[in-house]
Structures are given as C-alpha cells and as structure tokens.
C-alpha cells in the first residue's frame, strides 16, 4: 500500500515537472521537439556531405574523398 502511494506521488511529481519546464504547456514535449528540429542547421551537418569516390578529382587543401586524396585524385 505504501509502495503504491509512493509510485503514484512520484508519477504525479514527474508529470507536473515535465509540464512546468516545457516552453508551451498546452503542447507539452511535442512542441519542444518541433522547435529543436527547426533550430538545427542542416548545412552544418557533416552527415549531409557527399564524399567523392575513387578516380574523381579532389581539392588538395580540403579533400572530400571517401578514402584519401592522392595527386588531386581520390583513391
């Protein structure tokens, strides 16, 4: 019985804390995830960059080859 009361109080506390720390309590956490997605800079992500395959011409100072840049060609 005591454990059940403690669990109920803990769940109520965590729920109240979640809504109190959210920017917009009407939308809860859903709104936070949407804002975080729009605040990201997709151009800054290195995952969006395409690497050059073997045989393509590469830049010596800033190579974007999948492996290595040797004599201005990707290996």
UniProtKB/Swiss-Prot annotation:
UniProt subcellular location: Secreted
Propeptide segments, given as residue ranges: 23-49
Disulfide bonds: 51-66, 58-69, 65-74
Keywords, alphabetical: Disulfide bond, Ion channel impairing toxin, Knottin, Neurotoxin, Secreted, Signal, Toxin
Tissue specificity annotation: Expressed by the venom duct.
Signal peptide limits: 1-22
Chain segments annotated as coiled-coil in the UniProt record: none
Highest taxon of the lineage: Eukaryota
Main location: secreted
GO cellular component, one term: extracellular region
Pfam families with a match to the protein in the record: Conotoxin (PF02950)
Transmembrane domains' residue ranges: none
GO molecular function, one term: ion channel inhibitor activity
Domain topic, free-text comment: The presence of a 'disulfide through disulfide knot' structurally defines this protein as a knottin. The cysteine framework is VI/VII (C-C-CC-C-C).
Family from the record: Belongs to the conotoxin O1 superfamily.
Protein's recorded name: Conotoxin Vc6a
Originating species: Conus victoriae
């Amino acid at each position: 019985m005591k454990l059940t009361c403690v669990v109920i109080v803990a769940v109520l506390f965590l729920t109240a804390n979640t809504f109190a720390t959210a920017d917009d309590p009407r939308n809860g956490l859903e709104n936070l995830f949407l804002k975080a997605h729009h605040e990201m800079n997709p151009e800054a992500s290195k995952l969006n960059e395409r690497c050059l395959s073997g045989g393509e011409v590469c830049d010596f100072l800033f190579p974007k080859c999948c492996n290595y840049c040797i004599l201005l060609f990707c290996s």
